[in-house]
Amino acid sequence: MASLRKTHPLMKIANDMVVDLPTPSNISAWWNFGSLLGLCLVAQILTGLFLAMHYTSDIATAFSSVAHICRDVNYGWLIRNLHANGASFFFICLYLHIGRGLYYGSYLQKETWNIGVVLLLLVMATAFVGYVLPWGQMSFWGATVITNLLSAVPYVGNTLVQWVWGGFSVDHATLTRFFAFHFLLPFIVAAAVIVHLIFLHETGSNNPLGLNSDTDKIPFHPYFSYKDLIGFTVLLTTLTMLALFSPNYLGDPDNFTPANPLVTPAHIKPEWYFLFAYAILRSIPNKLGGVLALLASILRLMEVPLLHTSKKRKPYFSDPLTNFLFWTLIGRMWPSSPESEACLVEHPYVIIGQAASILYFSLFLVLMPAAGWLENKTLQ
């Protein structure tokens, strides 16, 4: 008699996607981050659901309701700390997942890659509106600055800003709709994840060698399911330790102060995981130019498959020059953003941000395609 998981209409779908999925036998730990992102999404939805039961989206009580959760709700402090720090771990896994896709040429699976970029935008939107909800000083001013960027849109900019705000400033209407978006968007992300997986399983997973692995595949369970469990254990242990011992390490001290529209913080900045994009926004003096560059810094990921000039699937892994350029990109992403953006707008941080922004776009649009073309010429 056939197993129920192979015959039941619903269980058969889950079985083909998780249990009996043919998987390349040589995928490394870098392929764990997809499942870790799924774990982060589930953890964020669950903790967020419990927080939403006690949170009030009213500017008069939002800040005190978060304090109430931490002080009076059973394990509310733990749930809040796991949710706040879970967002950071979500983005760590997300950026590592994207980096692996770039390094090993997974972007050539165009549908999967483009849905992944849409997922990145959705997660960034979710994190942004969620950051506003505690109604702290940096939350309020961050929302004011970022939403005000819509005023750079020609002709309809001011109307757009007032439409998003629900008035003439960031106020009660803004907080209410941001809470609604923050509750809704994770479920849209979950739906997009399913589409991402459907496209991925149409073509099959990539592997470190970039070769066709149809003749060398093994079932996902038990080989890689147990491997993923190790990743789950490491992630949950690290997240729990951070939430218990240093819960405010990745936060902003200004958010311990209730939002005050009359007092502007000395330096308005977003959470650390948005700094690379904020660095590009701030490096351009013109508002419209900065907004376009900000969007381009994310959407240029969709251009990566189109700018692939190498005859190899994964030039970053196999060619010394493109490998060097890839690690230059990683070097630009990590140290230069916090260095130039966690500081005031003054010399030399402005010029560092501008140089890093030029390097960022040059790598994707010029240097990496040129290196692939040069490699093809060398191999002829």
UniProtKB/Swiss-Prot annotation:
Domain of life: Eukaryota
Residues given in the record as a ubiquinone binding sites: 201
Membrane-crossing residue ranges in chain numbering: 33-53, 77-98, 113-133, 178-198, 226-246, 288-308, 321-342, 349-369
Binding site for heme b b566: 97, 196
Cofactor binding mode and count: Binds 2 heme b groups non-covalently.
Topological relation to the membrane, as annotated: Multi-pass membrane protein
A GO biological-process term: mitochondrial electron transport, ubiquinol to cytochrome c
GO molecular function, one term: metal ion binding
Classification via Gene3D superfamilies: Cytochrome Bc1 Complex, Chain C (1.20.810.10)
GO cellular component: mitochondrial inner membrane; respiratory chain complex III
Annotated localization: Mitochondrion inner membrane
Alphabetical UniProt keywords: Electron transport, Heme, Iron, Membrane, Metal-binding, Mitochondrion, Mitochondrion inner membrane, Respiratory chain, Transmembrane, Transmembrane helix, Transport, Ubiquinone
Note: Heme 1 (or BL or b562) is low-potential and absorbs at about 562 nm, and heme 2 (or BH or b566) is high-potential and absorbs at about 566 nm.
Role played: Component of the ubiquinol-cytochrome c reductase complex (complex III or cytochrome b-c1 complex) that is part of the mitochondrial respiratory chain. The b-c1 complex mediates electron transfer from ubiquinol to cytochrome c. Contributes to the generation of a proton gradient across the mitochondrial membrane that is then used for ATP synthesis.
Subunit structure: The cytochrome bc1 complex contains 3 respiratory subunits (MT-CYB, CYC1 and UQCRFS1), 2 core proteins (UQCRC1 and UQCRC2) and probably 6 low-molecular weight proteins.
Name this protein carries in UniProt: Cytochrome b
Designated gene of the protein: mt-cyb
